[in-house]
């Protein structure tokens, strides 16, 4: 039997074949473990913003088959399928409001295209969608808090007056008009985040459970 020296150990062909088999087994086990990790990764802390009509996150992940039909149906190129570096489970649809918000199509084509019900095809209206909720995260940077008069987030809101408004507040002895999000009406479309004039938007869309610490998506949209 042929043999060769590796360091101080004499390695036979049989030893080499056994080592190779063990390496393959470890690789397979590692691949299985990685796949299992991806499948069972908890989405609790995920900040992914889902398309309108999405079921609660766990139900959504169970129903979504990663087909991409919702992405193809969106006329604005809002939706993408998640890659490894994204804040969403691999292959699932999401969008980044700062890049392209949801333009709230009345016929909700993305939900209508879903073959499994991961996106609720029976959502009554786009105004019933619960993609998330806008949250004013940049109190230190929002121009209104600095005493300036900016109303862009209010003016661009597709349901202006219901989802967001300017309300008077006293800050450091000054009377200023501050953007106030009315979460019961906000759909999380992200138009306000997209149009914020700051380099880092002072207003951001977050999943409802993360933004408000309350119940998130449900099949009929938001519950008051």
Curated annotation (Swiss-Prot):
[4Fe-4S] cluster 2 binds at residues 102, 105, 110, 114. Residues 54-84, 91-124, 133-169, 177-208 form the 4Fe-4S ferredoxin-type domain. [4Fe-4S] cluster 3 binds at residues 142, 150, 153, 157. Pfam families: Fer4_7. [4Fe-4S] cluster 4 binds at residues 186, 189, 192, 196. InterPro entries: 4Fe4S_Fe-S-bd, 4Fe4S_Fe_S_CS, MauM_NapG. Residues 1-41 form the signal peptide. GO terms for molecular function: 4 iron, 4 sulfur cluster binding; metal ion binding. [4Fe-4S] cluster 1 binds at residues 64, 67, 70, 74. It comes from the Bacteria. Pathway: One-carbon metabolism; methylamine degradation. Keywords: 4Fe-4S, Electron transport, Iron, Iron-sulfur, Metal-binding, Plasmid, Repeat, Signal, Transport. SUPFAM superfamilies: 4Fe-4S ferredoxins. Involved in electron transfer. NCBIfam families: mauM_napG, PRK09476.1. This is Methylamine utilization ferredoxin-type protein MauM. It comes from Paracoccus denitrificans (strain Pd 1222). The gene is mauM.
């Amino acid at each position: 039997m042929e043999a060769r020296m590796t360091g101080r150990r004499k390695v036979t062909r049989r030893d080499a074949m056994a080592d190779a088999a063990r390496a393959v087994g470890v690789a397979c086990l590692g691949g299985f473990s990685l796949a299992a990790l991806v499948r069972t990764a908890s989405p609790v802390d995920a900040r992914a913003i889902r398309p309108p009509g999405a079921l609660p996150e766990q139900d959504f992940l169970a129903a979504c088959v990663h087909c991409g039909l919702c992405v193809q149906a969106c006329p604005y190129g809002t939706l993408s399928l998640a890659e490894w570096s994204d804040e969403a489970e691999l292959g699932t649809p999401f969008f980044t409001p700062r890049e392209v918000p949801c333009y709230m199509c009345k016929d909700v084509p993305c939900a209508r295209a879903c073959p499994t019900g991961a996106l609720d095809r029976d959502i009554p209206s786009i105004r019933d969608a619960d993609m998330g909720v806008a949250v004013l995260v940049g109190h230190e940077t929002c121009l209104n808090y600095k005493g300036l008069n900016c109303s862009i987030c209010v003016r661009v809101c597709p349901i202006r007056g219901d989802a967001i408004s300017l309300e008077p507040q006293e800050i450091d002895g000054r009377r200023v008009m501050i953007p106030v999000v009315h979460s019961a009406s906000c759909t999380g479309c992200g138009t306000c985040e997209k149009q914020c004039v700051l380099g880092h938007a002072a207003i951001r869309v977050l999943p409802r459970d993360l933004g408000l610490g309350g119940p998130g998506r449900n099949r009929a949209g938001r519950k008051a």
